[in-house]
């Protein structure tokens, strides 16, 4: 276990920030908490004390339960959450998720060795056991029969007294592996049971195992897009509906989602992060003393874990009790309309899209109040909810205006003179009204913060929170679905099965057997010879659905005409070789199409071979006319042909030109037909080029225009080409191969994440 991280603690570290270290009793927390029944609290504390402390690990064997030794009371020898140095925001968020599993999930980003997984497993070990209905495949709660899976109501068992049979199990902890298929995630046909019974029997997936527990996804940014979308759809709905392979089944799925990822290995798509309530970073800076303490406690844990468990035993037990009691308080916590208005205004000022920010923030604020043993939401709860939910989603203003000192409003004019008796009566009334107003204002001050975290321009008022928000901005991905995978039925990684469309190239044996399993009993009865053990018919056949990483194709369209042609060709050659040298892992391909004279030619077809590129680019032809339209149209043809081959997901054309053309497209494609035709005007040539640029945009191809025209004679037409094609434009009259390569890589990176 890699415990030498910067987020591990020393010397009796605290699980919670100082304000929430202990769960307050009703008599000491707030007036609302004081009104809670004392017998209720005593009963809950007794239940918490008598509950078994073990926790359950998933039946998939991801985390086996430990036995014996000093750590047996904690399950396996996890690193206790109370021993983690710092990371108060993340630890608070994890406790909130333990209190309310349906809070919306928690995403933790951070570099390697920042205790992301350590904290997730540490929280799981603190969760109390759960009561489930005997025979349930999805950990059904006996108190909520309306949420049971289909068919369970007809299969439940009762004891001699007529009571529903239940059992106490450890809280599930299910980890989603990166290579998981949809069948294993949502469930599929149980082949063995279906063969024996002759009917279709459902085999639950990991989502059924995770219900009412913890669903942990490590490196969610590397999870397959289809799987991640399916996963979050099910968690959002709270129910898994399976309609496939003759199965029609549904079961509840409401676990606590904890997702972790390293932003250096790829960002998470923005729409996925938007569907997770709390998004925090573990990369916050630590002091020198904290880093020393982290190494110290990690070393102690490796040498003697019993001592570390003993150090934080009190903190851990308090937190366990706090979770149990807070779950009961949460049922009675209320949030006022004025408080909701405050959260909505913060979300608006922060530039949050949609309504998820304020919805999640309201739920978090209620959980914070329940954690303190209160039935009302206070100011600190609202502020903390904004920091945990709204702040990471905010769109920071690039140039926030400095706050100006606001002048107080002028005093009202003095009232007109009145007689003494009426003045005394009015003074008495005003004193009574003032007392009522003071009481109301005092109560109101406890519920609504005096100032917003965001100012009217979207900037952050509290400078201490600026770094926290900037971390969220850096790890935020971009919207959209990237074409980084190519799906086929013959090459790649097996990700699922599908009904065949024509001849089957690769048979999905597992899916075929699942489809045939329910009919084995009937087919055996019809078989008179009794010679076969498994009967598979053509209608049972399933083909493999494969996926492989798709590279991008960069097509350099280079103006090889004029006096500067040789420089442009040399720079394009250098940029192409630089891209090829770095394209081994990304599978990117490069092509070069120079245009000169009357037409363009493919000097280097799409290739990943550096040797081939050097051989093809050894001689660089230059001089002659400038058939720009033919160069761009040739690039479109090459790109579309490469896309049809199935090896390219994205196409980008890099046009290195001054935008000046003097050869028409018709002359390039059919020189004999235009031999006697009059020479086209400059405007006709421009219209022809812009028409080709429009076709580039319609074909879904990205265009990067590098303008090499001298600024003293510039016409700006190269920029117009980029505008029509919805592409990017750089004015680089003296660009070197390194500059062109850097500009291309930047545009290519944006293209892949768009």
Curated annotation (Swiss-Prot):
PROSITE patterns per the UniProt record, alphabetical: VWFA
Keyword Plastid: yes
Molecular function terms from GO: ATP binding; ATP hydrolysis activity; magnesium chelatase activity
Ranges for domain VWFA: 553-751
Any GO BP: chlorophyll biosynthetic process
Ranges of Pro residues composition bias in the record: 407-418
Disordered: annotated segments: 1-41, 397-448, 665-684
Biased composition (Acidic residues): 421-443
Record Gene3D superfamilies: Magnesium chelatase subunit I, C-Terminal domain, P-loop containing nucleotide triphosphate hydrolases, von Willebrand factor, type A domain
InterPro entries in the cross-refs: AAA+_ATPase, BchD/ChlD_VWA, ChlI/MoxR_AAA_lid, Mg_chelatase_ATPase-dsu, Mg_chelatse_chII-like_cat_dom, P-loop_NTPase, VWF_A, vWFA_dom_sf
CDD domains documented for this protein: AAA, vWA_Magnesium_chelatase
Primary location class: plastid
Keyword annotations from UniProtKB, A to Z: ATP-binding, Chlorophyll biosynthesis, Chloroplast, Ligase, Nucleotide-binding, Photosynthesis, Plastid, Transit peptide
GO cellular component: chloroplast
Residue ranges, compositional bias (Low complexity): 1-14, 24-41
Pathway: Porphyrin-containing compound metabolism; chlorophyll biosynthesis
Catalytic activity as recorded in UniProt: protoporphyrin IX + Mg(2+) + ATP + H2O = Mg-protoporphyrin IX + ADP + phosphate + 3 H(+)
Phenotype caused by lack of the gene: Homozygous KO plants are chlorotic lethal.
Entry's EC annotation: 6.6.1.1
Subcellular localization(s) per the UniProt record: Plastid, Chloroplast
Transit peptide: 1-45
Family according to the record: Belongs to the Mg-chelatase subunits D/I family.
Subunit structure, interactors included: The magnesium chelatase complex is a heterotrimer consisting of subunits CHLI, CHLD and CHLH.
Function as written in the Swiss-Prot or TrEMBL entry: Involved in chlorophyll biosynthesis. Catalyzes the insertion of magnesium ion into protoporphyrin IX to yield Mg-protoporphyrin IX. The reaction takes place in two steps, with an ATP-dependent activation followed by an ATP-dependent chelation step.
Name of the protein described by the UniProt record: Magnesium-chelatase subunit ChlD, chloroplastic
Organism: Oryza sativa subsp. japonica (Rice)
Gene that this sequence comes from: CHLD
């Amino acid at each position: 276990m890699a415990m030498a991280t910067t987020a591990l603690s020393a010397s009796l570290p605290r699980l919670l920030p100082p304000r929430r270290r202990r769960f307050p009793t009703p008599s000491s927390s707030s007036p609302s908490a004081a009104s809670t029944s004392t017998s209720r609290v005593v009963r809950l504390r007794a239940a918490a004390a008598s509950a078994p402390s073990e926790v359950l690990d998933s039946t998939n064997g991801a985390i086996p339960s430990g036995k014996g030794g000093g750590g047996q009371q904690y399950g396996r020898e996890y690193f206790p959450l109370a021993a983690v140095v710092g990371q108060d925001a993340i630890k608070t968020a994890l406790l909130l998720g333990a209190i309310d599993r349906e809070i919306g999930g928690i995403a933790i980003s951070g570099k390697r060795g920042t205790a992301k997984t350590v904290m997730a497993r540490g929280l799981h070990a603190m969760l109390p056991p759960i009561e489930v209905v005997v025979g349930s495949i999805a950990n059904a709660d006996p108190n909520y029969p309306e949420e049971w899976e289909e068919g369970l109501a007809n299969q439940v068992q009762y004891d001699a007294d007529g009571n529903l049979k239940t059992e106490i199990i450890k809280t599930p902890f299910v980890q989603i592996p990166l290579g998981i298929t949809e069948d294993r995630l949502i469930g599929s046909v149980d082949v063995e049971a279906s063969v024996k019974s002759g009917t279709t029997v459902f085999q639950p997936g990991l989502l059924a195992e995770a219900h009412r527990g913890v669903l942990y996804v490590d490196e969610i940014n590397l999870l397959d897009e289809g799987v991640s979308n399916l996963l979050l759809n099910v968690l959002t709905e709270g129910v898994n509906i399976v309609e496939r392979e003759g199965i029609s089944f549904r079961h509840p799925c409401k676990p606590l989602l904890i997702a972790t990822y390293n932003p250096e290995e790829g960002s998470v798509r923005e729409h996925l992060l938007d569907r997770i309530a709390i998004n925090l970073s573990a990369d916050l800076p630590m002091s020198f003393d904290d880093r020393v303490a982290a190494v110290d406690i990690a070393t102690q844990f490796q040498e003697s874990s019993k001592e570390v468990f003993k150090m934080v035993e009190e903190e851990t037990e308090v937190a366990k009790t706090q979770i149990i009691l807070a779950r009961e308080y949460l049922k009675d916590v209320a949030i006022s309309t004025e408080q909701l208005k405050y959260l909505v205004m913060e979300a608006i000022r922060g530039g949050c899209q949609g309504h998820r920010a304020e919805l999640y923030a309201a739920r978090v604020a209620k959980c914070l109040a329940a954690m303190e043993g209160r039935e009302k939401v206070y100011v600190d709860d609202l502020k903390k909810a904004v920091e945990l939910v709204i702040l990471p989603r905010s769109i920071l203003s690039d140039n926030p205006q400095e706050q100006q000192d606001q002048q107080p409003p002028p005093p009202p004019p003095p009232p007109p003179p009145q007689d003494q008796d009426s003045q005394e009566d009015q003074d008495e009334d005003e004193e009574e009204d003032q007392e009522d107003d003071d009481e109301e204002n005092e109560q109101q001050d406890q519920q609504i913060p005096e100032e917003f975290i965001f100012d009217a321009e979207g900037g952050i008022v509290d400078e201490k929170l600026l770094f926290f928000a900037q971390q969220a901005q850096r790890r935020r991905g971009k919207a959209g679905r990237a074409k980084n995978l190519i799906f086929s039925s013959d090459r790649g990684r097996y990700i699922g099965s599908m009904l065949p469309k024509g001849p089957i190239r690769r048979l999905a044996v597992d899916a075929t057997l699942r489809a045939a399993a329910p009919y084995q009993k009937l087919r055996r009865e019809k078989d008179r010879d009794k010679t076969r053990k498994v009967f598979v018919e053509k209608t049972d056949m399933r083909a493999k659905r494969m996926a492989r990483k798709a590279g991008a194709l960069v097509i350099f369209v280079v103006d090889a005409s004029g006096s500067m042609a040789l420089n442009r060709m040399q720079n394009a050659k250098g940029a192409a070789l630089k891209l090829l040298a770095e394209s081994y892992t990304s599978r990117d391909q490069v092509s070069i199409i120079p245009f000169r004279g009357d037409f363009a030619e493919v000097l280097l077809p799409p290739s990943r071979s550096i040797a081939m590129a050097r051989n093809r680019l050894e001689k660089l032809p230059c001089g002659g006319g400038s058939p720009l339209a033919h160069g761009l149209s040739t690039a479109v043809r090459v790109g579309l042909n490469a896309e049809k081959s199935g090896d390219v997901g994205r196409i980008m054309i890099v046009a290195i030109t001054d935008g000046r053309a003097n050869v028409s497209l018709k002359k390039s494609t059919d020189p004999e037909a235009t031999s006697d035709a009059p020479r086209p005007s400059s405007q006709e040539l421009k219209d022809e080029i812009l028409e080709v640029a429009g076709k580039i945009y319609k074909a879904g191809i990205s265009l990067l225009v590098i303008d090499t025209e001298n600024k003293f004679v510039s016409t700006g037409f190269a920029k117009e080409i980029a505008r029509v094609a919805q592409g990017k434009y750089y004015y680089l009259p003296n660009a070197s191969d390194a500059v062109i390569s850097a500009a291309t890589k930047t545009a290519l990176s944006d293209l892949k994440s768009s």
